[in-house]
Structure formats: structure tokens, C-alpha cells
A protein has these predicted regions:
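Active-site-lining helix/loop region of Rossmann-like oxidoreductase modules
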Residues: 6, 10, 50, 187-194
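Glycine-rich, N-terminal phosphate-binding loop and its surrounding beta-alpha-beta segment
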Residues: 38-110
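Hydrophobic, Leu/Ile/Phe/Ala-enriched alpha-helical segments that form helix-helix packing faces
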Residues: 12-19, 85-88, 125, 129-133, ...
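Short, Gly/Pro- and small/polar-rich lid/capping loops
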Residues: 2-39
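Alpha-helix initiation and N-capping motif
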Residues: 5, 9, 78, 147-151
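Glycine/serine-rich phosphate-binding loop and adjoining beta1-alpha1 elements at the start
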Residues: 73, 93-194
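Charged, low-complexity, helix/coiled-coil-prone segments
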Residues: 18-32, 59-74, 104, 130-141
């Protein structure tokens, strides 16, 4: 059985047979610009230390900064994240959005963590990746099992580390304590429209 990234590359091959994009163009889309795996140590509420595996894939930034969500799921793994980053690059290009494709994640069942553990994990992801993030570099967003509150923690951690006072590094954050206008359900509405 193929993994998600192998499936994505099979789709690319099929599209190339139909559209004949050219070998050079296809070669550039076969691998991400960056494929980052990190270990995130988190002090658990019981005093123990647990190490979580995290990812960020920056697939292609030919059209603009990398853009894509961060997912928290017990089955998240690098081939899934690579495939999703590839598809994000394609979606942005097809829709004419001046962003590249990126995706991130952590292998975790967030329902098994306390709010404090979840916050420490989220901040730890940013601590490991802050050098590559930013409004003109890589702009993460919520995805599976991540929330506006998690995006707010991540943005806060980014600003603490870098000293940059920006709200543009992470999208999907609460605005004045409320959910961002239009965010809840926007993916579903977009899918229905497409």
C-alpha cells in the first residue's frame, strides 16, 4: 500500500501525462524544499518528561511564503505531512494565491494532554522552528485538532523568541478574544464551493 506522499507523486505523474509540464518542472515538484523533523521535550503534569515528534515541511515557495496548517494527531507522520504540503503548494498555485505550500504536525493525541501540557507542546514546536517562521518566510495555520487558542500560544512564543511584534506569523488566531471572523467552518464552505 502506498503512503500519502507516494500517492501525491502518482497524482503528479498522472497530471504530467495529461498536461506535459516538462521534466524540469516536474523534477522541482518531486521533493520539498525542506523536510524538518524535530523532537519536542515536554514536562508533563506528573513531573515526567515526554518526547514528541514534530514536523514542518516547506514544499515550494516559488509563488510566495510557505503556507499551511499544523495538525495534532496520533497518526501524523512525515509522509502525510509531505503530501499535504505538496497539495497546499498546488492549491495555492491553482487558486492564484501568492503563497507556497507548507504543512506541519505533531504525532500526538491532544485529547490525552492537559491544557498546560498542550500549551507547552505547542510552544515547544515554535521554539524548535522559530528560525524558519515569519510573515515573509512560513505562515502556519490551524488544521486537524489545532485551535485558535493554540495558534495564539504559538504566535506569542514566536514573538517572545524573535522580539518581532507581529500577528502575521500564524493565521487563525482569536481576535479580541473571539474566533476569527469566518474561520469556523471555512474549510467546509470552501470545499462545498469548489
Amino acid at each position: 500500500m502506498k503512503n500519502p506522499f507516494e500517492n501525491a507523486m502518482a497524482q503528479l505523474d498522472k497530471a504530467n501525462k495529461l498536461a506535459k509540464f516538462g521534466d524540469e518542472f516536474i523534477a522541482r515538484l518531486r521533493q520539498p524544499d525542506r523536510d524538518i523533523r524535530i523532537s519536542i521535550p515536554v514536562k508533563m503534569d506528573d513531573g515526567s518528561l515526554k518526547i514528541f515528534e514534530g514536523y514542518r515541511v516547506e514544499y515550494n515557495n516559488a509563488l510566495g511564503p510557505y503556507k499551511g496548517g499544523i495538525r495534532y494527531h496520533h497518526d501524523t507522520e512525515i509522509n502525510e505531512v509531505k503530501a499535504l504540503a505538496f497539495w497546499m503548494a498546488i492549491k495555492c498555485a491553482v487558486a492564484g494565491i501568492p503563497m507556497g505550500g507548507g504543512k506541519g504536525g505533531i504525532t500526538v493525541d491532544p485529547g490525552k494532554l492537559s491544557k498546560g501540557e498542550l500549551e507547552r507542546l505547542s510552544r515547544g514546536w515554535v521554539q524548535k522552528l522559530s528560525d524558519i517562521l515569519g510573515p515573509h518566510k512560513d505562515v502556519p495555520a490551524p488544521d486537524v485538532n489545532t485551535t485558535p487558542e493554540i495558534m495564539a500560544w504559538m504566535n506569542d512564543e514566536f514573538m517572545k523568541i524573535t522580539g518581532e511584534k507581529t500577528g502575521a506569523t500564524f493565521t487563525g488566531k482569536p481576535l479580541d478574544g473571539r474566533l476569527p471572523a469566518g474561520r469556523p467552518g471555512s474549510e467546509g464552505r470552501g470545499t462545498a464551493t469548489a
